[in-house]
Design a protein with these regions (language model features):
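Sensory-module boundary signal marking interfaces of small helical input modules
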Residues: 18, 32-35, 88, 202
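PAS-family sensory domains
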Residues: 21-31
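Sensory-domain boundary capping and coupling elements
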Residues: 10-12, 27-29, 166
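Conserved long alpha-helical elements within nucleotide-processing catalytic cores of c-di-GMP signaling
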Residues: 36, 43-47, 53-79, 86-116, ...
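Cyclic nucleotide signaling catalytic output domains
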Residues: 121, 147, 151, 157, ...
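Per-ARNT-Sim (PAS) sensory domains and their PAS-associated C-terminal
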Residues: 1-12, 21-23, 246
Length: 308
């Protein structure tokens, strides 16, 4: 059989004679191999993802911060990539988590292979991954993102099923976009979220993206307040029969004027309602308000049927 390494803990004392010279020693040897194995397993659980074997968020953030500290001393730039798979939720919802886990494991292996030896990479969320690496002078920070997209965009085959997942990737640069891993990952996440909403791809962070996110968050809070306090309005656009010139109906349109007196375009607040989970509440309010208006018109003798 092949030799096996074992860990031992040695404790002992030295007995000295009258001249203070050692004359004998005695002690114990304790086999601690099992204890070391347990410690190693606990370390793996604490710092590595059990499904993919990649460093977890805690470990990845720590390693990336060490890279930033080294880059700061050397005066070099670091790129931080935030990777999110585009259609992974559909796989879990349609085929279950066993299939989803196998697909994710394959994608994680590709992700690891596409990263260079000295890169820091980790799984930071359900289907979210990060990669940090030092930029060479003149290197395009989006080039690595494109390489990752190519590797992750190839079909994954599992149990005779073929899945095309793909990835959206946001990129932030040290020191231009932040001085800590937390800030860089947040900014890369913002860039990823923006490009994902536009159909996927890769995007370098800029300050305008941060302002755009702040406005979206602010609008979400204001919209929730407006719905709770019935501050939206229904405007009705008439439909006229061209041959007779008579009114044949109206189209109900949701409109919102915020507390500062600014009209918010439906093209802006409806996507926010979808993101914040308010779209059903908005629909309920629209139908309720339209029903009230129909009743009012009927009581006034008008026979107008709105299209909501």
């Amino acid at each position: 059989s092949s030799p096996r390494v074992r860990w031992v803990e040695m404790r002992g004392v030295i007995e000295k004679g009258r001249t203070d010279q050692p004359i004998r020693g005695y002690g114990t040897l304790l086999d601690i191999t099992d204890r070391k194995a347990t410690e190693h397993a606990m370390e793996r659980l604490a710092f590595y993802d059990s499904l993919t074997g990649l460093p977890n968020r805690t470990n990845g953030m720590m390693l990336a911060q060490q890279m930033l500290d080294q880059a700061r001393q050397a005066g070099v730039a670091v790129a931080v990539l935030f990777v999110d798979f585009d259609r992974f939720k559909e796989i879990n919802d349609t085929h279950g988590h066993i299939v989803g886990d196998n697909v994710l494991s394959e994608l994680a292996a590709r992700f690891r292979s596409a990263c260079a030896k000295n890169d820091v990479f980790a799984r930071v969320g359900g289907d979210e991954f990060m990669c940090a690496y030092k930029l060479a002078p003149g290197e395009d920070p989006l080039e690595r993102a494109k390489q990752l997209q190519h590797a992750l965009g190839l079909p994954v085959v599992f149990d005779s099923l073929k899945f095309e997942v793909g990835a959206s990737i946001g990129v932030a640069l040290f020191p231009e976009h932040g001085d800590s891993v937390e800030d860089l990952l947040k900014h890369a996440d913002i860039a990823m979220y923006d490009i994902k909403g536009r159909g996927g791809g890769s995007l370098l962070f800029n300050e305008a993206l941060g302002l755009k996110l702040e406005r979206r968050i602010s609008l979400g809070a204001k919209l929730a307040h407006a719905l709770a306090h019935s501050q939206l309005q229904l405007h009705y656009q008439p439909k006229v029969h061209l041959a007779t010139g008579t009114l044949c109906g109206v189209e109900a349109l949701s409109r919102w004027c915020d507390e500062e007196g600014q009209w918010i375009s439906p093209a802006e607040f409806i996507p926010v309602a979808e993101e914040r989970g308010l779209i059903n509440e908005l629909g309920d309010w629209t139908l309720t308000q339209a029903a009230r208006d129909i009743r009012y018109w009927q009581e006034a003798g008008a026979a107008v049927v709105p299209r909501v």
